[in-house]
């Protein structure tokens, strides 16, 4: 009887503990955002924009400017990733020429981050549109410096 009571209490405790544990992803994303921001600011970058968990985003880039883009995604199930930034243009040759792919940067808990860097050349006009593609969906953080 004591053994049965002990196992019942142990089982109830385990079930209670399992029901209390939620996803740590949002906390890990917040931690990654803080570390990313600190690193970017130390290297002279300024904050431009943050996109919530999304598969696509767009920014307008200025000439002669460096951009630093981070994709932070849930790596719980180790998904295959496809992140990139490319010039939004109907000309596929130009789009291919001006496409950048990131490299893996770090993992904080279940949040994994990829970093992408590019510098815009001198061009006529004020800005050019750049599309950011994230598969799987990711939080996207963009920083810039002249």
Task: Please provide the spans of the model-predicted regions.
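Beta-sandwich interaction modules
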Residues: 59, 104-124
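Short edge beta-strand/loop segments characteristic of extracellular beta-sandwich folds
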Residues: 68-72
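Solvent-exposed serine/threonine-rich low-complexity stretches and specific carbohydrate-binding patches
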Residues: 96-106
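Short, surface-exposed beta-strand/strand-loop-strand elements in extracellular ectodomains
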Residues: 77-94
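Noncatalytic modules at the cell exterior or secretory-pathway interfaces
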Residues: 65-67, 116-137
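Sec/Tat signal peptide C-region and signal peptidase I cleavage site
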Residues: 14-19
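Sec-dependent N-terminal signal peptides
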Residues: 4-13
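Non-catalytic extracellular/lumenal accessory regions of secreted precursors
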Residues: 20-55
């Amino acid at each position: 009887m004591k053994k049965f009571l002990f196992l019942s209490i142990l089982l109830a405790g385990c079930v209670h503990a399992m029901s209390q544990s939620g996803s740590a992803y949002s906390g890990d994303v917040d931690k990654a955002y803080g570390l990313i921001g600190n690193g970017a600011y130390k290297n002279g970058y300024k904050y431009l924009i943050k996109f919530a968990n999304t598969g696509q985003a767009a920014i307008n880039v200025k000439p002669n400017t460096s951009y630093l883009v981070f994709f932070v995604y849930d790596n719980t199930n180790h998904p295959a990733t496809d992140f990139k930034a490319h010039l939004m243009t109907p000309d596929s040759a130009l789009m291919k020429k001006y496409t950048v792919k990131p490299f893996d940067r770090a993992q904080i808990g279940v949040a994994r981050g990829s970093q992408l860097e590019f510098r815009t050349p001198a061009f006529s006009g004020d800005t050019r549109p750049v599309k950011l593609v994230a598969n799987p969906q990711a939080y996207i953080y963009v920083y810039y410096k002249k």
